[in-house]
Amino acid sequence: MCPQRQFQSFTTTAESTLSHTTHKQLSGATIYDEPENFLEIEVCNPKTHFPSGDAKGMYTDYEIICRTNLPGFSKRSSSVRRRYSDFELFRKLLIKELQLSNHPKVSVQHLPGKILLSNRFSDAVIEERRQGLNKWLASVAGHPLLQTGSKVLVRFIQDPTFQG
């Protein structure tokens, strides 16, 4: 379980674009209904691994939890684990996908920087990176064109065997 159950939710409903005055006129049941289209995503639960029993092979991965009802996603809820290098590959493939699909105006931000310090496995550093990756993925997943048209985004968020 993620320590803070605070999903980033992105809706693409007509109701989400209504004015404040119109919103007040909606019934209580309508206001609290599930949005027509939504994508909730969170990067959480970092876990450090020691595959060879020594510090040389150590790495940290992060759980990505997703809930959605967008038609392009095959699963309504999913949980996968990703390393920082997976995020790097995802960003590279996403930029390539955007260029090929003629959407060069969609800007993909840089990832939070690589950590090259000896304390990169400290709890504070890992939490800082988790927060940075969560913010970065929220900005990517929150883009309407990527929510509805990126096959790379869907694979990264939902395919446990994501290899690019």
From Swiss-Prot:
A 1,2-diacyl-sn-glycero-3-phospho-(1D-myo-inositol-3-phosphate) binds at residues 83, 85, 114, 120, 129. The keyword Mitochondrion does not apply. Its main location: cytoplasm. One of its GO terms (molecular function) is phosphatidylinositol-3-phosphate binding. One of its GO terms (cellular component) is Golgi membrane. It holds the Pfam family PX. Disulfide bonds: none annotated. It is found in: Cytoplasm; Golgi apparatus membrane; Prevacuolar compartment membrane. Residues 40-163 form the PX domain. InterPro entries: PX_dom, PX_dom_sf, Sorting_Nexin. Gene3D superfamilies: Phox-like domain. GO terms for biological process: endocytic recycling; late endosome to Golgi transport; protein transport. Keywords: Cytoplasm, Golgi apparatus, Lipid-binding, Membrane, Protein transport, Transport. Transmembrane segments: none annotated. The PX domain binds phosphatidylinositol 3-phosphate which is necessary for peripheral membrane localization. Required for retention of late Golgi membrane proteins. Component of the retrieval machinery that functions by direct interaction with the cytosolic tails of certain TGN membrane proteins during the sorting/budding process at the prevacuolar compartment. Binds phosphatidylinositol 3-phosphate (PtdIns(P3)). Belongs to the sorting nexin family. This is Sorting nexin-3. It comes from Kluyveromyces lactis (strain ATCC 8585 / CBS 2359 / DSM 70799 / NBRC 1267 / NRRL Y-1140 / WM37).
